[in-house]
Amino acid sequence: MTRFGMTLLCALSVLIVSAEASDLAIEPGQWKVTSTTLMNGAVTPSGVKARCLSPGQAADVAKTFGPVSGTVNSTCEPAESEIAGRVLKWHLLCKGQLDIDVLASFNFDSPSHYTATVSSKGRMAGQLISDVKTEIEGERVGECQQ
C-alpha cells in the first residue's frame, strides 16, 4: 500500500460496514497479500505483506475488508456497501478540508483467494491532489505463524 493510502487509512477512525455476509466467508490463517499501486500516473513497486486472519475476521469479511472513515477536518458519509455472491463492494465519501472519494471491489473467488481494486481520489479546494488505484491479490498460504 502506498504512503498516501496508509496515511489515509491511519487518519481515519473506525466505521463498521453494515452488510450481510452469511455466504461470504474465507479461510482463517496466514495470507500473502500482494499490492501494486498506480499513484498520480506513476507505478510504485509492488509490495508483499503477510496477514494473519483469525476465525472471526475470516467469518466477517464485510467488517474485515470494509472501509474506515472519519478524517480530521472532514466529515464522512456512512459507507455504502453491497455484497453480491462472493463480491464485496463499498464506497466511502468524505468532505471537508480534504475531500476523499474511495471505491473498492473485492472478489473472493474461492475461500483461499481474492483479488481487489481500491481507487481513491483526494481533493483540496476542488483541486485533485491524489489519484490512487491499488490492485490487490490475497492468497492463503497456511496456518498463522506464532
Predicted regions and their residues:
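Short beta-strand segments that buttress and anchor functional surface loops
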Residues: 33-36, 89-95, 117-122
